[in-house]
UniProtKB/Swiss-Prot annotation:
Keyword Kinase: yes
Any one biological process term the GO annotation gives: ubiquinone biosynthetic process
An example Gene Ontology CC term for this record: plasma membrane
Membrane topology qualifier: Multi-pass membrane protein
Leader sequence segment: none
InterPro entries assigned: ABC1_dom, Kinase-like_dom_sf, UbiB, UbiB_bact, UbiB_kinase
The encoding gene: ubiB
NCBIfam families: PRK04750.1, UbiB
Positions with a binding annotation for ATP: 129-137, 152
Descriptive protein name: Probable protein kinase UbiB
Positions of the Protein kinase domain: 123-501
Length: 543
């Protein structure tokens, strides 16, 4: 380790110990060297013993800085790995840091654009509009049209910080299986690898621009969701330029109510937007926390969401969507056998899983949920319970489903914050059932024919030739089979003859040997010689 890494590791250890996070390690895992080491660090006592463990973990991550804050935010979505009291605290982590100097932002933008800022923009505001751990946002106007825009620029110093902290995370991850009872199940190195990929994706703003363009296209003209326009000609890997929007933060309930917003419709549209993204488009915004969602000032009686920050998106393939929709419908129909079979058929759990045992486990965990009124049942917790039960039956972690679960929890929490009486199932069920009918009915057949029509139109002129080639190949195959059959029959005949000759040879050898013990001298020698000849001929037949 470099001196810089050693200093950073010392700081991490000091912060962890000052918040008493050594309590995460069970006493039975504290070996003698660890106990001695902890006592030697007596000047690092737990200074927050009055606070619960989950809160202490959150405060420690906040003190360690933006990379660790984002790591905690990601881990808050992995409720299969942590008890609720810790996961709930991690969701409270705020990705807010002081902005860096606007003059430095201007210099970084000019470096990325390859010229003076005034070439493309007017009225650039060096005071940041918003600031987070990875990037910050400034306002300006396009020189050509006067359109108000925002420029999102990556922090110049963030890459080396991320690389250094991620390297330390890998080193610490190697110790987790040794120190924690569930260490192997947590798969710490995979968790760090997933986090590293997420961070690197967020550092490439061209990826975010492409995501925003796709999402905007999917909801073009929709009254439910508006996505600001991206000006891709001005975008670079470290700079994103998009339309500036004005809206009410979705978490600002008093302002929404004062505006006269139809809160019931707004909450229901949040659910509809989510299921439309997942099942219609197979492309969903996976970072839909309140800081990224606004509500348009226009038409409060017919409210429209505004979505920003498309750095993290998820997608489901056709099979995942179908299995997920069928799982939801089967669960709310309390058909646990169907739920178990769907998990096996989808490959989410191994094929050799005992379906009866799996069904019983799902029933045991999920049946108590129906003690509540249907309107109070949490979709996100349903999904969480299903996945946690499935993991006991060796379900592999599905990254796309983890993202989906996280987003669903966001959407559900947001919807009930806006309108506490929101019945998520009543809102979602018609959509899911309609989507399922569309997938298996006549429209699905017609759609499949349309999709395949260009392929068959291209192949149609070739069909006679393909048919002739197929007949020729069948003929050649039949000839090969006949030849092989004849060879096998000839081989069986030779094997039969060989066995006969071996038997005759053995008889002659035994007879000659017996007669040699008598007074006859020449005749037995001939018998033995004949036996040897029979053996040689039989051996030749076999080869």
């Amino acid at each position: 380790m470099t001196p810089g890494e050693l200093r950073r590791l010392y700081l991490i250890v000091r912060v962890f110990l000052s918040y008493g996070l050594d309590e995460l390690i069970p006493q039975m895992r504290l070996t003698l060297p660890l106990r001695v080491g902890r006592r030697l660090l007596f000047w690092m006592p737990n200074r927050h013993a009055d606070k619960p463990l989950g809160e202490r973990l959150r405060l420690a991550l906040q003190e360690l800085g933006p990379v660790w804050i984002k790591f905690g935010q990601m881990m808050s979505t992995r409720r299969d790995l942590f008890p609720p009291q810790i996961a709930d605290q991690l969701t409270l982590l705020q990705d807010r840091v002081a902005p860096f100097d606007g003059a430095l932002a201007r210099k970084h933008i000019e470096l990325a654009m390859g010229g003076p800022l005034e070439t493309w923009f007017d009225d650039f505001d060096q005071q940041a509009l918003a600031s987070a751990s990875i990037a910050q946002v400034h306002t300006a106007r396009l020189k050509t049209t006067g359109q108000e825009v925002v420029l999102k620029v990556i922090r110049p110093d963030i890459r080396p910080i991320i690389k250094a902290d991620v390297r330390l995370m890998y080193r610490l991850a190697a110790w987790v299986p040794k120190l924690m009872p569930d260490g192997r199940r947590l798969r710490p190195r995979e968790v760090v690898r997933e986090y590293e990929k997420t961070l690197l994706d967020e550092l490439n703003l061209l990826r975010e621009a492409a995501n925003a363009i796709q999402l905007r296209r999917n909801f073009d003209g929709s009254p439910m969701l508006y996505v600001p326009e991206v000006y891709s000609d001005y975008c670079r890997e470290s700079v994103l330029v998009m339309e500036r929007i004005y809206g009410i933060p979705v978490s600002d309930i008093p302002t929404l109510e004062k505006q006269g917003t139809n809160m019931k419709l707004l909450a229901e549209r949040g659910v509809q937007v989510f299921f439309t993204q997942v099942f219609r488009d197979s492309f969903f915004h996976a970072d839909m926390h309140p800081g990224n969602i606004f509500v348009s000032y226009e038409h409060p009686e017919d409210p429209c969401y505004i979505g920003i920050d498309c750095g993290i998106v998820g997608s489901l393939n056709k099979d995942d969507k179908r299995y997920l929709a069928e799982n939801f419908i089967a669960f709310f129909n309390r058909d646990y056998r169907k739920v178990a079979e769907l998990h096996v058929d989808s490959g989410w759990v191994p094929r050799d899983t005992n379906v009866e045992d799996f069904e019983f486990a799902i029933r045991t965990v999920c049946e108590p949920i129906f003690e509540k009124p249907l309107s109070e049942i949490s979709f996100g917790n349903v999904l969480l319970n299903l996945f946690n039960t499935a993991r006991r039956f060796n379900m592999e972690v599905q990254p796309q489903l983890v993202l989906l679960q996280k987003t669903l929890l966001y959407v559900e929490g947001l919807g009930r914050q806006l309108y506490p009486q929101l019945d998520l199932w009543t809102t979602a069920k018609p959509f899911l059932e309609s989507w399922m009918r569309d997938q298996v009915g006549i429209p699905a057949v017609i759609r499949a024919l349309k999709e395949k029509a260009p392929f068959w139109a291209e192949k149609l002129p070739e069909l006679p030739e393909l048919f002739y080639d197929s007949l020729q190949q069948h003929k050649l195959l039949q000839q090969s089979v006949d030849k092989l059959t004849n060879q096998m029959q000839a081989q069986r005949v030779r094997q039969g003859q060989s066995r006969y000759l071996f038997g005759v040879g053995a008889t002659l050898l035994v007879s000659g040997t017996i007669l040699l013990s008598g007074d006859v001298e020449v005749f037995p020698a001939w018998l033995i010689a004949a036996g040897i000849v029979s053996w040689v001929i039989g051996w030749k037949r076999t080869t």
